[in-house]
Amino acid sequence: MTTADNQPLGQALAENQAFLQTMFGGSSDFYTKSFTICGCRCCIAMFAGLSSPEKLCIMVLHALGQGVPGCKAGPQLVQYLAEQSCLPTEQTPITTRTQLVEALAGGMAVLLAEGSGQALAFSTQDMPGRSVTNPSGEGNMRGPQDAFTEHLRNNISQLRRQFRTGSFTAEICTANTRAKTEYAICYDTALAPADVVQTLKQRLAGVQIPVLLDSTYFASFLKQDKLNLFPAAAYTERPATACARICEGKIVILVSGSPLAMVVPSFFAEHFECLDDYSSGAVFAGLIRLLKYLAFLLAVFGPGLYVMAVSFAPELIPVHLLAKLAQGEASTPLPPMPEMLAVTLLLEIVREAGLRAPKSISHTVSLVGALIIGETAVSDRKSVV
């Protein structure tokens, strides 16, 4: 397969067929069918697995087989099908080779006619994909239980189903990648600031990367300060959460092939929120969120405060606890600082092994790691006592 240029389509059907054979002739899933309608030679091209032969037969070939009144040449046939027929064609005819390749790769069936420099793309997409399931990384007790999938238009339809207003807008764009991956910018025109939307479009259009596999690829290009440790965007796999963010005036970015939606702009406090906070009472939800903040502060500053207190300010520790800590440190071959780093490193190794290993052994790895760490802690406790 070679690279398609932006040259216009030829008038001769044989020339366009030769171009398609040059591009996709070596692919076993590429399918073409030549036929004649009202004396006009035509050709249908599609990819098996991306387009449905059943849809093509029912909607296109059956209608074309009935004959096209008054059409004796290719340009008249294309014009009639594009403007007067009820077939599901794209709004704009294909005029260049690049558009032809992108339409075929997008799962459409393309009709080429002799003597016409335009082609028609029919919406016969039938791409296999994962069905809607429960979100794996955002569990909740109440509320919707559906999650995004890898199909871009299905994800947009999930948002459209919950956001039933005319101000909801989903703009599908093509990334500047070799694979020409599609992404969607979803927002509410009545709530999202127009200047923010325009700035975001310009930044995303200027992204130059070889491949776009996930919405997280855009994160580094949206950050103004590269040294800022706080995330520039939030992520969710729940359509309900994405819809709630759109109602707040934020912008949601969906990428074809990714079940993860990016929400911009994002605040650090929003990473502690979940759907259950809004389905519970205000007092209970506030206490749970406060607990999350305390847990975060403890996880971030707890090890450092412990090392600081043991190494540099032992007078801050109660005497009876300090004596037990001293006994434990006497039997430990490492000082407090390297000891804490070693424990943190071991925890990260166990977590990474449990996350990346195959599912058949990941639970075993996590269980063995927990048993080893627990046994070490119990043994250390016994030695102190």
Predicted regions and their residues:
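Membrane-embedded alpha-helical signal segments
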Residues: 1-301, 315, 319
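Short glycine-/small-residue-rich flexible loop motifs, especially phosphate/cofactor-binding loops
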Residues: 160, 243, 347, 374-375
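Core alpha-helical transmembrane segments of integral membrane proteins
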Residues: 282-352
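Membrane-helix interface "capping/anchor" motifs
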Residues: 291, 352-362, 378-380
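Small-residue-enriched core segments of transmembrane alpha-helices in multipass membrane transport
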Residues: 293-300, 364-376
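Short alpha-helical transmembrane interface motifs in multi-pass membrane proteins
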Residues: 331, 355-358, 373
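Membrane-helix boundary elements
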Residues: 339, 349, 372-373, 378
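Conserved small/polar residues in nucleotide/adenosyl-binding loops
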Residues: 384
